[in-house]
Amino acid sequence: MTMLGLVLVMGTLSMGNFVSGQQTLDLKTPGGNEAFGGDNKGSVLLVPKEHSVNIVANMDTPPKEGKTFEGWLADVGGSAYKLSLGEFSKNGTLDYAGMMVNPYTYTQFVVTEEPFEDTDPNGASVVAGAELVSPFGQ
């Protein structure tokens, strides 16, 4: 009985570090009174768990000829840092899984339209995005 109590207490303590908050958000164009108050262009699913995050994003329309979509996590209002999550596949999907020291500092998921085989590490203009909700934005 004592061992079971110890396991329950340890399990409770370790749960204190667990942060979860799966969210599915619409990807919208910039505009309106909000950062992304325009037309719906796709969706993004974010599944954070402690120091890992899985992201699946889908764009409803293809990029322009000679262009490709790229996904980013952005720390808007903080460091202004943008982390590239890579290029969307030809079917319009981005599938990202990674370990991060603090994924919750990011406040937006954005999509840019980049030249195909782009060598510039900076992002082009944002074509769609979403404001992240808690536990993000900490």
Predicted feature descriptions by range:
Residues M1-Q138:
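N-terminal targeting/export leaders
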